[in-house]
Every structure is written in structure tokens, then in C-alpha cells.
Amino acid sequence: MPRSQRNDNFIDKSFTVMADLILKVLPTNQKAKEAFAYYRDGMSAQGDGEYAEALENYQEALRLEEDPNDRAFILYNMALVYASNGEHNRALEQYEQALALNAKMPQVLNNMAVIHHHLGSIAQEKGESDEADRRFDLAADFWSKAIRLAPNNYIEAQNWLKTTGRGSADVYL
């Protein structure tokens, strides 16, 4: 049974009903409707912590979806699942693919920065200063790009860039 038919949560049910209505009224082809249904089910599974099911749905949505922007959001959600599972390199690969399709996704840039910062902290704890510096530099680069796209967001990242001296002046304008 499709996930959309077995939701017990009121919010999930409401989202599913609204999504189904939108699918019925929007003039779109059957393949796009199927892709959205898989994407919707993937988001629902992800929200329930059912990551394997979420990935299956996202992979099917990605196979069906033709719109580059929509594909970018599918890849973004897949990356979130991989990151939640501690598969940081796989998450970074998905984020890179999402950016290749839509370079104006500050949330992707932010999440890539978070992963690199995390990996930098781990390297620092292990005494691997070169790797830590490399990861922190990557984090700074991704956060700087995210802040340029969304200047009012990522305040903690802005503070980190300032306190570590890794940010350039144009990021704070």
C-alpha cells in the first residue's frame, strides 16, 4: 500500500490530501505526477525516520522526474537521508549533483559546510591538523556562498567565519 494511503498523522494526512488535489488540478503529464507521488511518499517516510523507504521513493522519483529544479530537490532530500545515516561522503555527492542542477540552493551550501565542519572537527580531535584545516576551509567556502545567496540566514555561520577569520568582508555586507 502506498505510504500516502496509510498515514496516521493528521499533518501527513492533510499534506497528502492537499498534494493529491494539486496533482489533479495542475496540467502536468502522468510521469510528472508519478514522480511527485514518489517524492511525497519519500518525504513522508523520511519524516517518520524510515530512511531506506525514503531513499527507495526518492530514487524512483529521480528516475521519473525530468525538471532539473525538481531533480535538485530530490537529490537534496536524498543527501539529508545519507547525512542522517552518517554517510557524509555520499551526502556530499548528492549535494554536488543538486548544485549542478540548481546553483541557487543556499540550504545545500549550508549543509555541505556543516558536513565539512563536522569532518574538520573530527580530524582536529585526531590531531590531523592539515585535514582539519582543509575541511574548515571548505566549510568556510560553502558558508560564504550560502550567505551570499541568503544574507539574512546562517547567523551562526557568519559568526564562525568572523571569529575564525575565514570569511571575507563581502560576506558580511
Swiss-Prot record:
SMART domains assigned to the protein according to its UniProt record, in alphabetical order: TPR
Keywords from the UniProt entry: Membrane, Photosynthesis, Repeat, Thylakoid, TPR repeat
Any Gene Ontology biological process: photosynthesis
The keyword Electron transport appears for this protein: no
Location in the cell: Cellular thylakoid membrane
Cellular component terms (Gene Ontology): plasma membrane-derived thylakoid membrane
Classification via InterPro entries: PSI_Ycf3_assembly, TPR-like_helical_dom_sf, TPR_rpt, Ycf3/AcsC/BcsC/TPR_MFPF
Top-level taxonomic group: Bacteria
Gene3D superfamilies in the cross-refs: Tetratricopeptide repeat domain
Membrane-protein topology: Peripheral membrane protein
TPR repeat ranges, renumbered to this chain: 35-68, 72-105, 120-153
Family note: Belongs to the Ycf3 family.
Matches recorded under HAMAP family: Ycf3
Function: Essential for the assembly of the photosystem I (PSI) complex. May act as a chaperone-like factor to guide the assembly of the PSI subunits.
Protein name as annotated: Photosystem I assembly protein Ycf3
Organism the protein comes from: Synechococcus sp. (strain RCC307)
